[in-house]
């Protein structure tokens, strides 16, 4: 165990996602201390050795070591990447039974250390497991965050930017709802340079509208395509987790589409779901309730109902 000298991030689960996330943290100089925790201690130790050998090339060398749950006591942020992976043909919701029990053990072990920081959940189905983390930890809802639709939104902006030949950073568009098959695009509020995307395609005809629909389908189904080709997705989500981590540790008050607890916004209660939220050192400062059109409202409530149906099997509502 190291002596705290700055921001500490504990990464639980050093598989593809956890190791890629730790690598992103180191390369971007986001954290001062990174502790790697895994049931396979040799894997965590090997990763720590590998990262330390590259420390001389990092913009801000962090202390990196393999540890155990006691190291979470002084952590500012615990990021859970552990759990069963999604296999070809499986949906994210198929993973619930496998991962609920794993999460109970992880979260209870973290809390037993005296941990008083924030949780960030990456494991799928992320909305369900973020809710489970909140329940198992007993922490205030704003201190438990899921990666939500941050990657879906990034995919959406990339594909729209590619279609319109503009930088994705200049595309303002959100994917909200479940990080999964019932997610939805907020076309009514999507714009490029202040010009609504719907207006941009008006003059392009029916084929342009069909292309937008194809873009969303490619966003929604991206994980299936990547899993089929290479077995797992990890680089994109690792970079998304690093972005959320920076917003937290640097107290940015950044708006990101994370899995946040709703207790009224969007007409929903008692569910974690992907929505834009203001993120800072204290966790979720507030949920941003963007205006949805009637069709988007219908699809958002359908997405929330899907998640609640799963939650009802495990938690008393």
From Swiss-Prot:
NAD(+) binds at residues 17, 38, 43, 69, 83-84, 105, 122-124, 147. One of its GO terms (biological process) is lactate metabolic process. The lineage of its organism: Bacteria, Bacillati, Bacillota, Bacilli, Bacillales. GO terms for cellular component: cytoplasm. Its EC number is 1.1.1.27. InterPro entries: L-lactate/malate_DH, L-lactate_DH, L-lactate_DH_AS, Lactate/malate_DH_C, Lactate/malate_DH_N, Lactate_DH/Glyco_Ohase_4_C, NAD(P)-bd_dom_sf. Substrate binds at residues 86, 92, 124-127, 152-155, 233. Pathway: Fermentation; pyruvate fermentation to lactate; (S)-lactate from pyruvate: step 1/1. It is found in: Cytoplasm. Homotetramer. Catalyzes the conversion of lactate to pyruvate. Belongs to the LDH/MDH superfamily. LDH family. This is L-lactate dehydrogenase. Its main location: cytoplasm. GO terms for molecular function: L-lactate dehydrogenase activity. Beta-D-fructose 1,6-bisphosphate binds at residues 157, 172. The modification Phosphotyrosine is found at residue 224. PROSITE patterns: L_LDH. Allosterically activated by fructose 1,6-bisphosphate (FBP). It comes from Geobacillus kaustophilus (strain HTA426). The active site is at 179 (proton acceptor). The keyword Kinase does not apply. It catalyses: (S)-lactate + NAD(+) = pyruvate + NADH + H(+). It comes from the Bacteria. Keywords: Allosteric enzyme, Cytoplasm, NAD, Oxidoreductase, Phosphoprotein.
């Amino acid at each position: 165990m190291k002596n705290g000298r700055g921001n500490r991030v504990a990464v639980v689960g050093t598989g593809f996602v956890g190791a890629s996330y730790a690598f992103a943290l180191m390369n971007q100089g986001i954290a001062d201390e990174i502790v790697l925790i895994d049931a396979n201690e040799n894997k965590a130790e090997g990763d720590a050795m590998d990262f330390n050998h590259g420390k001389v090339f990092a913009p801000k060398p962090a202390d990196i070591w393999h540890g155990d749950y006691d190291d979470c006591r002084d952590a500012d942020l615990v990021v859970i990447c552990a759990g069963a992976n999604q296999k070809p043909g499986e949906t994210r919701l198929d993973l619930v039974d496998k991962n609920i029990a794993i999460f109970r053990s992880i979260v209870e072990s973290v809390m037993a250390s005296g941990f008083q920081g924030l949780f960030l959940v990456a494991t799928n189905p992320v909305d369900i497991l973020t809710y489970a983390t909140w329940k198992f930890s007993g922490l205030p809802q704003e201190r438990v965050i899921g990666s939500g639709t941050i990657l879906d939104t990034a995919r959406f902006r990339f594909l729209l930017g590619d279609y319109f030949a503009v930088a994705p950073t200049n595309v303002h568009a959100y994917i909200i709802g479940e990080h999964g098959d019932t997610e939805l695009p907020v076309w009514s509020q999507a714009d490029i340079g202040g010009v609504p995307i719907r207006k941009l395609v008006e003059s392009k005809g029916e084929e342009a509208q069909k292309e937008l629909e194809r873009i969303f389908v490619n966003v929604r189904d991206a994980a299936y395509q990547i899993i089929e080709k290479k077995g797992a997705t990890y680089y994109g989500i690792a970079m998304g987790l690093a972005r959320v981590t920076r917003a937290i540790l640097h107290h940015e008050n950044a708006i990101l589409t994370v899995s946040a607890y709703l207790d009224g916004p969007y007409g929903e209660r008692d569910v974690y779901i992907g929505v834009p939220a203001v993120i800072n050192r204290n966790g979720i400062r507030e949920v941003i309730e963007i205006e949805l059109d009637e069709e988007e409202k219908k699809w958002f409530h359908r997405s929330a109902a899907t998640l609640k149906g799963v939650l009802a099997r495990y938690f008393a509502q």
